[in-house]
């Protein structure tokens, strides 16, 4: 027994073939399957609140929720559904590609933010100011690498090119090589001349034993005079002061005449025959034992 494709109710009928509910005023698309030239059809949409929405009109192929009871048949509506399916797939793939591109962009931003501090670090291979290109001229390393406006100049000859800068009266590296050598030689010559002047101005060392020699000579002169006059004396007293360290100090003792006669001791004939005994504590009158300071 063949089952009826419809279930009729008071509001309409339910089609078992398409699974849709139709009103009495409209017929199911199952009845129009054999009529391929039908220009209009009826579509029923299921709403989220459980109600039924029906739309009549020409071919509609923009809604993604379109449900047609002739999907299993080779009608133009089937081709439209296939196109809608392709369109949905392309839309979903486009959305997924957009999402993936969005996440890639976020990931790239995060990577850039992490590596940004290292990119701001200055490189050590940056251009460095060249040395010896402006200040030294053709002099090489001694010219000094600086700005041409601040080029080093010699304090004497005002040159800016020299193989070596030398110290001068204005401070270190204030003279060129030639002027520095001349300045150094002049400085040494001045120092040597100053030293010679100081040595020449020193007083000439005199004989520190001059007063001793004069006293020694005066002493012998007085002694000879006394001996020539024949005056006997017991202890010699010189009017001239003789230093305590003078080696010619001597003390003579004269014995009485009786002892002198008893001992038969006579002095030299030059003394007038006056006998006396001479005791000398140190023999300073002997030239072999006394140093002559006059030599």
From Swiss-Prot:
It is found in: Nucleus. One of its GO terms (cellular component) is nucleus. One of its GO terms (molecular function) is zinc ion binding. Expressed in vegetative and inflorescence shoot apical meristems (SAMs), axillary (SAMs), floral meristems, developing ovules and stamens, vascular tissues, and in the embryo. Transcriptional factor that specifically binds 5'-GATA-3' or 5'-GAT-3' motifs within gene promoters (including its own promoter and GATA21 promoter), thus regulating the expression of genes mostly involved in hormone responses and floral organ specification (including genes regulating hormones responses). Regulates both flower and shoot apical meristem (SAM) development, especially for establishing organ boundaries in shoots and flowers, probably by controlling the number and position of WUS-expressing cells. Coregulates, with AGO10/PNH, the shoot apical meristem (SAM) organization. Homodimer. Forms heterodimers with GATA19, GATA22 and GATA21. Interacts with JAG. Binds to AGO10/PNH. This is GATA transcription factor 18.
């Amino acid at each position: 027994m063949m089952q009826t494709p419809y279930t009729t109710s008071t509001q309409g009928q339910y089609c078992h073939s398409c699974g849709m509910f139709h009103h009495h005023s409209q017929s199911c698309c199952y009845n129009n399957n054999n009529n391929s030239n039908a220009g209009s059809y009826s579509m029923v949409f299921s709403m989220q609140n459980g109600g039924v929405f029906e739309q009549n009109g020409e071919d509609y192929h923009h809604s993604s929720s379109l449900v047609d009871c002739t999907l299993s048949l080779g009608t133009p509506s089937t081709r439209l559904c296939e196109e809608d399916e392709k369109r949905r797939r392309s839309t979903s793939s486009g959305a997924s590609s957009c999402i993936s591109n969005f996440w890639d962009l976020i990931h790239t931003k995060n990577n850039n933010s992490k590596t940004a501090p290292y990119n701001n670090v200055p490189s050590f291979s940056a251009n460095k100011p060249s040395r010896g290109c402006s200040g030294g001229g053709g002099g090489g390393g001694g010219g000094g690498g600086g700005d041409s406006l601040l080029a080093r100049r010699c304090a004497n000859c005002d040159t800016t090119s020299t193989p070596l800068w030398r110290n001068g009266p204005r401070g270190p590296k204030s003279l060129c090589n030639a002027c520095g050598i001349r300045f150094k030689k002049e400085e040494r010559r001045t120092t040597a001349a100053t030293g010679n002047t100081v040595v020449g101005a020193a007083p000439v060392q005199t004989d520190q034993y001059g007063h001793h020699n004069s006293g020694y000579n005066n002493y012998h002169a007085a002694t000879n005079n006394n001996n020539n006059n024949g005056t006997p004396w017991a202890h010699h007293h010189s009017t001239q002061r003789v230093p305590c360290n003078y080696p010619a100090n001597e003390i003579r003792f004269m014995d009485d005449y009786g002892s002198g006669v008893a001992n038969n001791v006579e002095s030299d004939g030059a003394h007038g025959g006056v006998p006396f005994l001479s005791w000398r504590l140190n023999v300073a009158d002997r030239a072999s034992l006394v140093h002559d300071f006059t030599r």
